[in-house]
Amino acid sequence: METFSSKDMALKAQKKILSKMATKSMVQMIIDDTSSEILDELYRVSKEYTGNRSEAQKVVKDLIKVVVKIGVLFRHNRFNEEELKLAQNFQKKLRQGAMTAISFHEVDFTFDKTVMSDILTESRDMLLKLVNTHLTTKSHGRINHVFNHYADPELLTQLYNSSGPLKPHLNKICNGLNKLLENGTL
């Protein structure tokens, strides 16, 4: 007997539509102003680092799509108890990453590219495990693309170079992360 669920079909349709329409302007209602500012700075970092506008747009677009899809899954209660625990651990890892990024920024000569890269890699692995049965391999590829890009030790080294061109972007990213931590969003 075939099992059909209109709820599942609606969720699939919503994810499909969101994957086609997940642009910054459409996602404004899902992503707050502070997060949007951080995304803008991440775009600028990627654009300056790669020298490739379309690659920078793709990385940030992939990030937005993943955030929106996970938001849809969460709002539709698609995660079981084990996955919800994993989601909490992922959130803790993100908080740890944000606090580490801020600490490295605020305290001179403390930056360690291996620590930052490892946190991002562990976060990627946790997220892939969380969405393993919920998202397509294409979405898994997006997750890998985003995390592998920002976990690149050379990018991180340039980002934390106190006299480098990416420093102003790091200032704004860390200010935004501080806001998200203070208001409990992250």
Swiss-Prot record:
Keyword field contains Nucleus: no
Key words, A-Z: Immunity, Innate immunity
Membrane-spanning segments: none
GO biological process, one term: innate immune response
Pfam families: DUF758
Keyword Magnesium: no
CC per GO annotation: cytoplasm
Protein role: Acts as a negative regulator of innate and adaptive immunity by maintaining immune homeostasis. Negative regulator of Toll-like receptor and T-cell receptor function. Prevents hyperresponsiveness of the immune system and maintains immune homeostasis. Inhibits jun/ap1 and NF-kappa-B activation. Promotes Fas-induced apoptosis.
Similarity field: Belongs to the TNFAIP8 family. TNFAIP8L2 subfamily.
Entry note about domains: The central region was initially thought to constitute a DED (death effector) domain. However, 3D-structure data reveal a previously uncharacterized fold that is different from the predicted fold of a DED (death effector) domain. It consists of a large, hydrophobic central cavity that is poised for cofactor binding.
Protein name (record): Tumor necrosis factor, alpha-induced protein 8-like protein 2 B
Species the sequence originates in: Danio rerio (Zebrafish)
